[in-house]
Amino acid sequence: MNKLKYLGMGLLLMAATTFTGCNEEDDLNPNSIFSEETTEKNEFDLWLLENYVKPYNISFQYRYFDKETDQNYNVIPADFEKSKAIAKLVQFLWLDVYNDLMDGDKTFIKTYTPRVIQLIGSYQYNSQGSIVMGTAEQGMKVMLYGINDIDLDVPYANVDDPYRSQFEKPFDLNANYFHTMHHEFCHVLTQTKDYPKDFQTISAGAYHSTDWVNVTDKQAAKEGFVSGYASGEYNEDFAETFSTYVTLSPAGWQKIIDQAGEEGAAIINQKLEAVREYFSSTWNIDLDELRSIIIRRSTEVENIDLRTLN
C-alpha cells in the first residue's frame, strides 16, 4: 500500500529556574546533560552491515524509533528474534530474487531499492477497518508491520490460493509481506519511469475511490481488478496487477481469472499485458522469468532456519 506519510515533530523545552543564591566559587559542570553513548553493535548488527549496508546501502532498522512511526497509531516494537528472521526472509524472497533475475548483478536492486527498512511489531489499524501491512515513503523508506506474528518454525509463502485469508495458519509470508514488497517496489519503478497513460483508461469510471475497503477480492475480480485494493485507483491497480501476478503460481493466477468470469477476465488480462509490456520495454524485465524465480524461492523458504543468522 503506497501511503505517503510526512511526519513533523516539534520539540519544546521548558525550564523553570529558581534563583535562591549565587556563589562565585561554584563551577559549571563541563559535562553535557545529553547522553553521548552509542549502542554497542551485536551479532545481528554486524550481520546487517555485511548483508544490507555494504552490498545495498540499506539501513535495516529493527530497533523501535518513536519518531519513525505515525503518531496517530499505537504500535509496539518488533521482537528481536523475529526481526532477525524477517531480515533473512527479505534477503531471500526479495533482494536475491532480483539478483537472480539479473544474473547476480546487484546494480539494479542497489540502485532502486528503498534506503531504509523499518520494522514494527504490530499492525496499524485504520478507522475504516483496513489493516496497514506495509507503507512506502517516496520510494526511500519501507515500513513493515506485524513482525511479531511471524512463525519462526513454519516459514510459509502461499503461491496457489489468492483467496486464502492472511490470518489463516500457517502465517503467510507472501500475503503479509512480500506481495506488499513487490507492490511498493513497482511504485518505485513507475515513479522513476512512468508507465503509459493508456492503462488509466482500461477501468476508467469503475474505481472505488472512497469505498475500496468494502470491495472483496472475489467481487473485485468480476469488475476487472485482481484485488479489492486494486479497485481504489489506477496507480494501485497497476502495482497490484504486477505484484499479484508475480507472487502467484499459474494455478493461483488462474483462480482469479476463473473467479472474474468472461468480462472481468478480459479486463484483467488487458491490464496484465500492459504491465508486461511496461516491464519488458522499460526495464528489460521478463515478467514470467521474474515470477518463476519468486515461485521457486517461495517454495524453498520452508527450508530456511529462521532461528539463526546462518
Model-derived segments and their meaning:
Residues N72-F80, L152, R164-D172, N176, ...:
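Second-shell loop/turn segments in exported
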Residues T17-G21:
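C-terminal motif of bacterial Sec signal peptides marking the signal peptidase cleavage site
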Residues M1-G8:
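Bacterial N-terminal signal peptides that target proteins for export
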